[in-house]
Amino acid sequence: KSAHMKKLSFIAGLLVLCACSDNKENSKTATAGPFSVDGKKVTVYTTADSSDYRLSETGTLDFREKGQPFENEITVFVDPSKTFQTYFGIGAALTDASAETFYKLPKEKQQELITAYFDAQKGIGYTVARTNINSCDFSSDMYTYVSDSTDKELKSFNIDHDRKFKIPFIKEAMKSAGNKLNLFASPWSPPAYMKTNSDMLHGGKLKPDYAASWALYYTKFIKAYEKEGIPVWGISVQNEPMATQRWESCLYTAEEERDFLKNHLGPTMEKEGLKDKKIIVWDHNRDLIYQRAQTYFNDPEAAKYIWGLGFHWYEDWSGGTPMYDNLKRVHEAYPDK
């Protein structure tokens, strides 16, 4: 089958969709039956510089049988008998910065923007969103939800900071998405008092004696957000655990992340009744993803808590080559993740 293309923009979009696929539950059903394109149409959205196209619907295309195309025809060939990972969704980061910027817009522009991204009928229908636990590099201030270093049981935990911008912003996105938004949350750093460098910035590590308290912190966040009417689909353990940054950051070796997960975070999620929440590990670049996967998944006590791996695409920041093949290696070695 082929979809005959008149616009290059759709090919770029298709590549993004393919690059974003990997999910534990759905991958098992990828070969459940033959894929049929009968009656299906391709909707083309175009964004182009020096034009009025901004996520603009610019046409529809049909799948049809086709032989050899001409050299000047842009064509994507699809083999329905060959399947890979199942496409889970695409989405956006709903951070403090995006929330604060959103509320600086006029009301009509707010609605236009949220509809364009999250409405499945009038927009492009994002179904996945990520937000931050504590402040991150897309926050205008540095904050946590607990400031008392003696409060290891987190009795003073509160999310008042998020009620002004981030929580209402996420609710707007959820409403536009018809409440079909898979939200996951990630920490950039624990509170400073929990870290070896006593600083939310500049790397540092989680102090071992705060591991139990930090694991409980994730569950407090999830429960607080869900009390506000925001379902949390899952979490990642740590954003970029190998990067010492000027902004919020915290370092974990593969072994440290594995042990924190199996000894603290995983058991605490279960104890707090959050076993159904998905846990994502790594959440960094593709260059080390296979080595990290071996450390996590070769330990059954850690692997049982892991839904999958998250990855970024910054490994070419120093002039290196993007390491796409590492994703294939991980999937081949651990197809159930």
Regions found by a protein language model. Name each.
Residues 1-4:
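Short, Lys/Arg-enriched N-terminal segments with co-localized hydrophobic residues
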Residues 6-13:
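Sec-dependent signal peptide recognition
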Residues 17-19:
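C-terminal motif of bacterial Sec signal peptides marking the signal peptidase cleavage site
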Residues 21-27:
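Bacterial lipoprotein signal-peptidase II cleavage site
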Residues 55-232, 253, 259, 263:
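N-terminal catalytic cores of secreted or lumenal carbohydrate-active enzymes
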Residues 93, 130-132, 184-186, 236-238, ...:
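A cross-family glycoside hydrolase active-site/sugar-binding cleft signature
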Residues 97-100, 134-138, 189-193, 238-244, ...:
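Solvent-exposed loop/turn segments at secondary-structure junctions
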Residues 212-234, 241-337:
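Active-site neighborhood of glycoside hydrolase catalytic domains
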